[in-house]
Amino acid sequence: MRKLGFCFGKDQSAESPSSLKIDIVIPAIEKDLDTLPYVIDFARLNVLHPISNIYVISPDSEKIKQVCTAKGCIQIHEESFLPFRKSDIDYRVGGVDRAGWMYQQFLKLSANCFCTEENYLVLDSDTLLAACRT
């Protein structure tokens, strides 16, 4: 994957074509630990806006905290800014519990509660930006 990032990444010496600072928000859980470091790396490599902060919203997890520390990101506990928990949501589609998906949507939409920039980009923890994006 590093080779792919190098091949498609922007020239690190080039100036950013945008002066609009943004924050990046990535909701994650422990099952995302295999991809999370790459999501962070590819975002830094391929987002053409100056990035102020990268926030990882997650449950209280030492493993995710370690990734955040190693990658210079800020971990936000998912229960620290919404007035309800995932367990408060009763949402089923075709008999399948979709409360986790619904909760994730609320987390994404509420990121303005902690982001320092007016504008922010939300990336899912399984989304690698393989080419430059504004």
Which residues are covered by each model-predicted region?
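GT-A fold catalytic core of metal-dependent nucleotide-sugar glycosyltransferases
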Residues: 107-134
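N-terminal anchoring/stem segment of glycosyltransferases
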Residues: 1-85
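Generic signature of intrinsically disordered, low-complexity segments enriched in small/polar residues
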Residues: 9-11, 45, 106-109, 117
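Small-side-chain structural scaffolding
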Residues: 39-42, 58, 100, 111-112, ...
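Active-site-proximal specificity loops/subdomain of glycosyltransferases
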Residues: 65-113
